[in-house]
Amino acid sequence: MASSHGPKKSLGQHWLKDPDILADIAEAAELTGDDVVLEIGPGLGTLTSRLLARANSVTAVEFDADLARKLPGQFPGKKLTVVNQDVLQFDLNQLPKNYKVVANVPYYITSKIVEKLMTAENKPSIAVLLVQKEVAERIAAEAGNMSVLSVSVQIFAEAELDIEVPRQFFTPPPKVDSQVVVLRTRNNPLITPEYQRDFFRIVKAGFSAKRKKLRSSLSGGLGIDKIVAEELLKNAGISPDARAEDLAIEDWRRLLKEWRAR
């Protein structure tokens, strides 16, 4: 039986079996009978069963060959496709438009998975991700607590925190608590593709020296004089004394506009 499969520490496996929490995660994806779901890391299939009950079909990408081999036999007659592959290598273009993602994400590849989903040509319409609580909070942060991660995600999607999952609900318990973050992909990113390179250069410069004021971090990160950095900020309606974490997405957009107008 699949349940006898012990979690592999090297793969960051932690089994979640609580039926109420699993139901809440599946519900967060707002599934209908027409939906195609990409499940990342199905593990023992405890969440898979709930997704199959709600969606049209599920494509489950599982890196662990032992688990991938066992999964299909657990759901005979169901529309389940199991792919034994590293999800970072999985071609999202195989999936139809407006597919949905549901995943209990291994902590060690969370940022890479989020980046893959948000920058893909074929993005999901919604991604429901169970991740480390601190990471979920960073992804969904607002002005005052922003980071490169939150800015990077929020130009592509609206981010909303959902249920918290304390560590004791996992086997074995991880060292930290988890939380569901729901990403609803924007029809159009807030920064168009041709400007994204400049945008991220500015954002990364702003966050390059977190404790410093923006005039200093932009000066160092962009290789410009502090006077020039201060002028850019003032023209964008931003206090030169502000710090990067204080800025909302709209502030960064105005700063990009001023940078390109130089």
Question: What do these predicted regions represent?
Answer:
Residues 1-205, 227, 234, 245, ...:
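Catalytic cores of RNA-modifying enzymes
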